[in-house]
Amino acid sequence: MVLQLRLSLLRKVGFGAFALTVISAPPAHGQSTFASMGGAWSGNGMVHLRGGTQERIRCRASYDPSSSGQSLKLELRCASDAWNFDLSGSVVQNGNSISGTWFESVNRVGGRITGQYNGGLMEARAEGDIVAALLTVRTMGARQSFLMEAPGAWAEHVSIDLHR
């Protein structure tokens, strides 16, 4: 029973972990890390589930950077035809490193994210008690794309394109 509960939670959390990638974009030339991300974003993508099935997903994000641009609060909602989740989080930038926390309220799970950025590319690791995912994020003006790889999780591969 405990194993089944953990597997069910892992399936749900595996997808939720990717969402934090959106909050960790690197700075544009001459701008602080998160200042250019403020506002509302939306977009679509695909989630590849364990077992080989795929689903289209829709996401909406709201970002609130601090006045210094060195920290960011977010809210993110994503849904497919079969499920949805509601994520909140915060991230802080320190030199080339980023770190933060996230909480997904539908499944009541959370964790940490850590990583680094270089130019327009961010690479990070999102972790919770029972999930880990590798994340790659590119931000280019009013467009953002990201990729999550979480082998063994319910959502093993997620790709999403967002725009303002």
In which residue ranges do the predicted regions lie?
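Central antiparallel beta-sheet cores of small beta-barrel/beta-sandwich binding domains
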Residues: Q31-M140, L147-R164
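Bacterial N-terminal signal peptides that target proteins for export
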Residues: V2-F15
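Sec/Tat signal peptide C-region and signal peptidase I cleavage site
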Residues: P26-G30
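Generic preference for hydrophobic/aromatic residues in regular secondary structure cores
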Residues: M1-Q4, A142, R164
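Short non-domain terminal segments
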Residues: V13-G16, S32, Q144
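Bacterial N-terminal signal peptides
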Residues: K12-S24
